[in-house]
A protein has these predicted regions:
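Hydrophobic/aromatic residues positioned on beta-strands within the core alpha/beta folds
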Residues: 99-101
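Active-site beta3 strand of CheY-like receiver
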Residues: 65-70
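Conserved phosphotransfer cores of two-component systems
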Residues: 62-64, 87-94, 116
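Receiver (REC) domain active-site loop signature in two-component systems and cognate sites
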Residues: 75
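Alpha4 helix (beta4-alpha4-beta5 surface) of REC/receiver domains from two-component response regulators
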Residues: 82, 103-122, 133
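Acidic catalytic/metal-coordinating carboxylates
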Residues: 52-56, 79-83
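Two-component/phosphorelay signaling modules centered on CheY-like receiver
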Residues: 31-49, 116
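Non-catalytic signal-transmission and effector/linker regions of two-component phosphorelay proteins
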Residues: 1-23, 129-143
Length: 143
């Protein structure tokens, strides 16, 4: 007599991460903004680093994994969309949230970013709770 096939195991849900395990990279050419975001996110318990250009972000992403990247759209040199595409090649698995001061004027840029896989878009000026809410929506965590 043949054996009964084993039932497939139910897929395991990923354990929620602790805030202290979530790595965040903030990329913006406005140094005051990146420093303020780093200070605020670190105070919330997230491991946070900054980069002030797309090139610097790519270098950091090749050296370390980031769970989430907050990326400014309008930067000199490599802009946010170019950086996003290259980040996808250099560091797949990082969720990207675009930050833009363009508001509604460049709807096409926002639509292109979303079509490429950007998880969310946040308009400047923003409140820190918009940033922390984006993190919670993208990466569920325990605390």
């Amino acid at each position: 007599m043949g054996r009964k096939p084993k039932a497939a195991a139910a897929p395991r849900q990923a354990e929620p991460k602790k805030r202290s395990e979530i790595t965040v990279l903030v990329v913006d050419d406005e140094m005051n903004l990146t420093l303020a975001m780093r200070r605020l996110l670190s105070a919330e318990g997230y491991r946070t680093e900054t980069a002030n250009s797309g090139e610097e972000a790519l270098h950091k992403a090749k050296e370390s994994h980031y769970d989430i990247v907050f990326l400014d759209v309008n930067m000199p040199g490599m802009n946010g969309l170019e950086t996003f595409v290259k980040l996808g090649q250099a560091a797949p698995g990082s969720a990207v949230v675009m930050i833009t001061g363009y508001g509604k004027t460049l709807k096409a840029v926002i639509e292109e970013a979303r079509s490429l896989g950007v998880r969310a878009v946040i308009d400047k000026p923003f409140k820190i709770n918009q940033i922390t809410e984006a993190i919670r929506e993208i990466i569920p965590h325990a605390d």
